[in-house]
Structures are given as structure tokens and as C-alpha cells.
Curated annotation (Swiss-Prot):
It comes from Bacillus subtilis (strain 168). GO terms for molecular function: ATP binding; D-xylulokinase activity. This is Xylulose kinase. It catalyses: D-xylulose + ATP = D-xylulose 5-phosphate + ADP + H(+). GO terms for biological process: D-xylose metabolic process; xylulose catabolic process.
């Protein structure tokens, strides 16, 4: 039996999985690393922590699996998007990495929007947001100019770890798409953008496909991990692209619903010219010459977490949600908007805050929970609605994360999205997508689709119920009015909020 390893470099920890040719996860490990937050809005990490914890996780994985190193054909990576790693000409790190959730770059974003207008949208198919890589680069250029002058190349987080394990520098299209420097449809760095902002295109790393073999392990890395030097290393992909691969989102009509702290609706896209006018993200997929569109709900699972911490800190989520299935659709006239930390899709608005509309004395805790679950799902449905309005088919939704752990919620998704919703048997997220890229790159399969047939198994399917679909359609129309009617109120309340 042969094996591959998938590595997922997350924001708080690195996860590794060992997968055999049947798609079975034979071992997994995880190692945490700290977040560095020196000021409000700052979010950084030391890239060295990623490297050391990844090597430790791999060493433990090999040790506990009892698999011989010669039977491990390849390794690939998934990683948190947008993070900025700057290297000098000696390939040494110049400063801590600035992460995707760092918000210091608002002034740079405003100036970029004023400078480029919709021209940036024509090239990158995305609007400027603080999370993207280019605004971080501009911040360093403005605030740490002497340091920035030493920059020979920039990398994304997973690409830096791969560089340290192989000695070669690359990035691939799915991660490059999140920099605001890539011409998405031409699949090349944009000299136009680089020239206009005064950054040399020479600092952009070489581009490869996600399944390309980029090298093998350095001797000291092989020695520390227990792997062989000849173990092939494949480029990998951005976490969302790998999450899509790991859930089988590889053909038109298939969409991913992922509910973690935030919520993501991600849909496969073949047509590179489809225009969403920046209302949703549009990125290169980990599957060659394919794309995906993505909408984000900032406080999806976070809404339930907030409710639990505030009103039921000693209960598990399973206990918390008991009895929700008995509450009728609409929670006895209660609607919730999940804007606890602002919103991303379809309203890019950092000032908006959440609402519970329709409260009365007859509502109890279960009504609030039902309303929160429905409100999160309505918010996610706004992204699906944008996809459908642009002519996309959404005939199957694969649900992963917190939203897939409760059958009532899965049925709710089927009814609100008005489509079939699939629960997976063995959900591994982006790490599985990375392993699949290694399996495909190693020649186990002719295509990622063939790999998905072998690796991904459905546990259950939920279908929309006509009477529920109609009720939710009425409620969804009411839900969409809440943003408009509370926007000015929340802006006026902003000065009263604790910073």
C-alpha cells in the first residue's frame, strides 16, 4: 500500500494527515503555534514557528503510523491565504508574517480603491480588502521602507514552509489569486499593478500548478521527520481551494458550505469571464484552469459560540441545540442577522452589527437558537442567491464544519438553499484536499475527479421540502430588509461602542 501526506497550515495550528490509496486517513497529528498581536488590529506570526511545528507534526505522524518511509509517495500543502512573508537576497525572513486577519491596512485599501477604481477588478476580479496581501506589502513599504528595500521575494505562508522543506521557491495560482497582484484569467503576475504602485515584479515568486512536483525533501528535513530525501513534494493550494478539492467541489453546480468561526459558500466556476462585479470573491481553483467563487459570512459559527459563551457556558453544543427541531420555522416570529463583527457578503460593511427582530415575552432560549441558526443560513443563502442571479447552477451543496454536525441544521440548509445538501462520511477539510493533490501529482489517478470518487464518501443526503421552502422564501425576503433598515442606526451607535 502506498501513502501520501496532506499538510494544512492553519491560523492557530498545523494539521498533517497520512492517507492511503483507498482514501483512508491512517494517522493524523496537529501542532499549535502562537499569534502575535502587538497592537489593536495587528495579527502576525513568526514563520519559523510554522516550520518547526510542521516538522514536529510530520515526525510524529511518521512515528505513530508505523508506515515505512519508502511507501510514502508524496507530500502537499494547504495554507491560510493572504499572509505576507518577506525574504531578503539570502532568503532570510525580514520580519514577522502579517496575516489575513490583520486590519491595519485600511488607509492603504482606501488609496488603492481611489487609484485603481474598477480597473483592479478587471485584472484581479476582487475588490480591495484589508485581508489581501498587496495592502500589507504597501503598509511595510510605507512604514518600514528600509526593510522593504531589502525584499528579494515575497511568499505566502504555506509556500514559505515548502521552501524551507525543499529549498526551492514557488507559489501556485490559487494562493497567488489572493494577493491582488495576479491577473486571474491570464494566470500571470500583473506588471500593470506592480508598476502603478511602485513595486518590482521581480519580488513575485515563480508560478506553478497546484499538482506540480516542485522538488523533494532537503536532507536535514528528511532526517528530522523520518521521511526519505527522495519523497516528492507538490505545490498544494490555498486553504479554500484545498477545502473545495477535499469536499469534491470539482464540477459545475457543486457548492461548498463550510461553517466554522466564519461561514463560506464556495462554488466551482468554469467560466473565467463570468462577472460578479466584485460582490463575491473570484479565485483560481486548485484544479488546473478552473476557478471558484466565494461568499463569506464573518460571524457564522461565531454567532452560536457567542450565544453559548454568554447564556450557556457550561453546556456542550450538542446539549445547547437539543429541542431546536421542535421549534417551528421562523422561531415564532424571530429573525436574527449575524453581523456581530460586521459583514463581508453581500454587504462589505465593518460598521453594521447584529439584530434580533421580533422579540416578545413568549420567546425562550430555544427560539433564540433556532433564529440564530436560521439567520446564519439566510446570510449564507445571500451568496447562493448572488451565484444564481449571475446564471450559475447550484444543484448540490456539500456541508462541512459546524453546520454538518446537526441534522436539523442540515435540513434547514436544504430548505433555505432549495437544493440537495450532502454530509460527508470522513470530513478532513483542506488537509484532505492537499493529500488529494499529492495523490494526483503522484500519478495514482488520471484526474482530481477520479481521486474524489475514491477518497470522498457521502454519509447522508438532505432534500428540500416544498412546504418549508416556501415558508423560508417569505422569511428570507423579510431578512434581507433588516440590513437596510438598521444600517444608519448602527453607524450612529458606533461612537458608543467600546474600542
Amino acid at each position: 500500500m502506498k501513502y501520501v501526506i496532506g499538510i494544512d497550515l492553519g491560523t492557530s495550528a498545523v494539521k498533517t494527515i497520512l492517507v492511503n490509496q483507498n482514501g483512508k486517513v491512517c494517522a493524523e497529528t496537529s501542532k499549535r503555534y502562537p499569534l502575535i498581536q502587538e497592537k489593536a488590529g495587528y495579527s502576525e506570526q513568526n514563520p519559523e514557528d510554522w516550520v518547526q511545528q510542521t516538522i514536529e507534526a510530520l515526525a510524529e505522524l511518521v512515528s505513530i503510523s508505523n508506515v515505512q518511509a519508502k511507501d510514502i509517495d508524496g507530500i502537499s500543502y494547504s495554507g491560510q491565504m493572504h499572509g505576507l512573508v518577506l525574504l531578503d537576497q539570502d532568503r532570510q525572513v525580514l520580519r514577522n508574517a502579517i496575516l489575513w486577519n490583520d486590519t491595519r491596512t485600511t488607509p492603504q485599501c482606501i488609496r488603492m480603491t481611489e487609484k485603481f477604481g474598477d480597473h483592479l477588478l478587471d485584472i484581479t476580479k476582487n475588490r480591495v480588502l484589508e485581508g489581501f496581501t498587496l495592502p500589507k506589502m504597501l503598509w511595510v513599504k510605507e512604514h518600514e521602507p528600509e526593510l522593504f528595500k531589502k525584499t528579494a521575494v515575497f511568499l505566502l505562508p504555506k509556500d514559505y514552509v515548502r521552501f524551507r522543506m525543499t529549498g526551492v521557491i514557488h507559489t501556485e495560482y490559487s494562493d497567488a489569486a489572493g494577493t491582488l497582484l495576479l491577473h486571474i484569467t491570464r494566470k500571470e503576475w500583473s506588471n500593470d499593478i506592480c508598476n502603478q504602485i511602485g513595486i518590482s515584479a521581480d519580488i513575485c515568486p515563480p508560478l506553478v500548478e497546484s499538482h506540480d512536483c516542485v522538488g523533494s525533501l532537503l536532507p536535514h528535513v528528511a532526517a528530522k521527520t523520518g521521511l526519505l530525501e527522495k519523497t516528492k513534494v507538490y505545490a498544494g493550494g490555498a486553504d479554500n481551494a484545498c477545502g473545495a478539492i477535499g469536499a469534491g467541489i470539482l464540477s459545475s453546480g457543486k457548492t461548498l458550505c463550510s461553517i466554522g468561526t466564519s461561514g463560506v459558500i464556495l462554488s466551482y466556476e468554469e467560466e473565467k469571464e463570468r462577472d460578479f462585479k466584485g460582490k463575491v470573491h473570484f479565485f483560481n481553483h486548485g484544479k488546473k484552469d478552473s476557478f471558484y467563487t466565494m461568499g463569506v459570512t464573518l460571524a457564522a459559527g461565531y454567532s452560536l459560540d457567542w450565544f453559548k459563551r454568554t447564556f450557556a457556558p457550561n453546556e456542550s453544543f450538542e446539549q445547547l441545540l437539543q429541542g431546536v427541531e421542535a421549534i417551528p420555522i421562523g422561531a415564532n416570529g424571530l429573525l436574527y442577522t449575524p453581523y456581530l463583527v460586521g459583514e463581508r457578503t453581500p454587504h462589505a460593511d465593518s460598521s453594521i452589527r447584529g439584530s434580533l427582530i421580533g422579540m416578545d415575552g413568549a420567546h425562550n432560549r430555544k427560539h433564540f437558537l433556532r433564529a440564530i441558526m436560521e439567520g446564519i443560513t439566510f446570510s449564507l443563502h445571500e451568496s447562493i442567491e448572488l451565484f444564481r442571479e449571475a446564471g450559475k447552477s447550484v444543484h448540490t451543496v456539500v456541508s462541512i464544519g459546524g453546520g454538518a454536525k446537526n441534522d436539523t441544521w442540515l435540513q434547514m440548509q436544504a430548505d433555505i438553499f432549495n437544493t440537495r445538501v450532502i454530509k460527508l462520511e470522513n470530513e478532513q477539510g483542506p488537509a484532505m484536499g492537499a493529500a488529494m493533490l499529492a495523490a494526483f501529482g503522484s500519478g495514482w489517478f488520471e484526474s482530481l475527479e477520479e481521486c474524489a470518487e475514491q477518497f470522498i464518501r457521502e454519509a447522508a443526503a438532505f432534500y428540500p421540502k416544498a412546504q418549508n421552502v416556501q415558508k423560508y422564501k417569505t422569511l428570507f425576503d423579510l431578512y434581507k430588509n433588516i440590513y437596510t433598515h438598521t444600517k444608519d442606526l448602527n453607524t450612529a451607535l458606533k461612537s458608543f461602542r467600546k474600542n
